[in-house]
Structures are given as structure tokens and as C-alpha cells.
Amino acid sequence: MITDTIANAHRYTALHPDFSDAIKLLQTLDFANLPDGQVACENPNIRLFIGSEAMRNREAAKPEAHRNHIDIQVPLSGTEAYGWIDRGRLQNGLGYNEQKDIEFFDCEPTTWLDIHVGEFALFFPSDGHAPLVGSEPFIRKAVFKIRTLETRASS
């Protein structure tokens, strides 16, 4: 997991061949004027979703993990808390959904952190994460889904 400010996101471009394109979008798109839904990306290894999501409390938040995608999650309208747990410590998997590349787990995160507007959280497949935690009823956010090195389309 990596957290940082959007202004510093360029520091991480060397970690993955598609991070440069994702970070360029992160730093240049006018998210306030984009409608909710999927945003078209030229790079076939990146999908971007913008939406308003219901928030929950920590007790209701259960970790999720992905196998084939890296998430960059960006709160656009407020503070979002994230639970984190190393994938090796996840317990009680509730079944992997291959089509959505997601599995939820019935266990507790080991760490919590707050991400504010102007910041992002980057989650690799090794990172179990429990997003959408906070005191507001809803949050508007952007989520980048970037294919892992093993599953990406060649350029």
C-alpha cells in the first residue's frame, strides 16, 4: 500500500509501466466536472470509475482483495478511512468473483488510515483493504483499476 498526495504521485511511475498514464489522468482530469460512471481511457490496462458511494462504519467494513488489478483510490468530496491488512493475514474468504476480480473476507483490518481530498491510496494485490469508511453518508471518489504486470495487455 502507498498513500501520498496527488502532487507527489509522479514519484511512483517507475513501479509499473501503466502508472505513468494513470497518474497523468489523476493529475490532469477535472473530476468535479466529470459525470459518475466509467471514464474512457486510451490505455487498455487502465479503467477509471467515478461515483458517489455510501459510507459505513468500521464495524461494517470487511477487507477486500484483488488478484489481477491494482487500485488507486481517490476521495473527491471528503475524508475516507481505509482499513488495511496484508493479504497473507486475510481470513475467512467469502469466495472469489473472477468477473469482478474481487474477494471479500470476514476478518478485521489491522491498520486504519484517513485519506483526504488531494491524496490517494494505492493498493496492490498483496493489500487487503476496507474502503468507504467515514462519518458522512456518501463520498464521491475516483477508482483507477490497473492490470497487474501478469495480466496487462502489451502496448
Describe every region a protein language model picked out.
Residues N45, H69, T79, E119-F120, ...:
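Structural motif
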Residues L113-G128, L132:
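Conserved metal-binding segment of the jelly-roll/cupin
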Residues F105-T110, I115:
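A gly/proline- and charged-residue-enriched helix-loop-helix capping module
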Residues L48-H66, L76-L90:
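Conserved short histidine dyad/triad with adjacent acidic residue
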Residues N43, E59-D71, G88-N92, N97, ...:
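A short beta-loop-beta micro-motif enriched in histidine and acidic residues
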Residues M1-F49, A60-A65:
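A short, N-terminal "cap"/entry segment at the start of jelly-roll beta-barrel domains
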Residues I72, F120-L122, P137-A153:
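A short hydrophobic beta-strand segment most commonly corresponding to one strand
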Residues N68-E80, G95-D101, K145-I146:
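Short, conserved beta-strand element in jelly-roll/cupin
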